[in-house]
Design a protein with these regions (language model features):
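Short glycine-rich substrate-engagement loop in P-loop NTPases that contacts/grips substrate
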Residues: 64-75
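Conserved catalytic-core segment of NTP-binding enzymes
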Residues: 95-171
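Switch II (G3) loop of P-loop NTPases
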Residues: 60-65, 81-99
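C-terminal end of P-loop GTPase domains and the immediately downstream helical coupling element
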Residues: 169-189
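Conserved NTP-binding/hydrolysis module of P-loop NTPases
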Residues: 47-65
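Structural motif
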Residues: 2, 88, 110-112
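Short beta-strand-centered segment that lines the nucleotide-binding/catalytic pocket of NTP-utilizing
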Residues: 26-46
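Glycine-rich phosphate-binding P-loop
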Residues: 2-26
């Protein structure tokens, strides 16, 4: 199973990715959550850990690490996704609907859409449909919110997650927990 975590920029995808990874690791019988960072934004797992310990140092390191999103990078990332063979693979992609993400996402099987702007969700849904990705969750990233909301769990998980901020442990949030259980369930089918 290869799940793309996608949506517009600055929605909190990397924060959600880290929270999901931690939540899944605590679930009994869960497969190892192999994460592919397929966007050169400088926010691998190291960034989340560094941001929790020293936010200023993490920002400085990210600025030094950040690279341009070239076609060559996208081709390499697409190969990582294509060749991923574990039971569960989570792919964190960049926040643009473009040919580079099309190349990377074309090797995935499922999608989780996270958006801080509800008006951008239909475009991401259409992009995923074009790539034959099964959308398993559509989540509104409510930065100003104070609580998660679960609207539906089937056939598509829908709701919101609040305050996705770098350096915050979001692994125990209700939306993260429900999504983690859903991903574990789907990966064992």
């Amino acid at each position: 199973m290869k799940v793309v975590l996608c949506g517009p920029p600055h929605s909190g995808k990397s924060c959600l990715r880290e929270g999901l990874k931690q939540a899944m690791r605590r679930l009994q019988g869960a497969p190892y959550p192999y994460v592919i960072t397929a966007c050169p934004d400088g926010e691998g797992a190291w960034f989340s850990e560094a941001a929790q310990q020293n936010p200023e140092l993490a920002r400085q390191l990210k600025a030094a690490y950040k690279a341009k999103f070239t076609l060559e990078f996208a081709q390499v990332a697409a190969q990582w996704v294509r060749d991923a063979s574990l039971a569960f693979n989570l792919v964190d992609v960049g926040g643009k609907i473009d040919e580079k993400n099309r190349l990377i996402m074309s090797h995935a099987t499922h999608a989780v859409i996270l958006a801080g702007d509800m008006n951008q969700i239909p475009a991401w849904q259409e992009f995923c449909f074009e790539l034959n990705l099964k959308i398993i969750a559509v989540i509104y990233s409510d930065y100003e919110g104070v609580a998660d909301q679960i609207q539906t769990e089937v056939p598509v998980l829908k709701g919101s997650i609040h305050y996705l901020e770098r350096g915050q442990d979001v692994s125990s949030r209700p939306m993260v927990q429900v999504l983690a259980r859903l991903l574990v369930s789907l990966s064992s089918v």
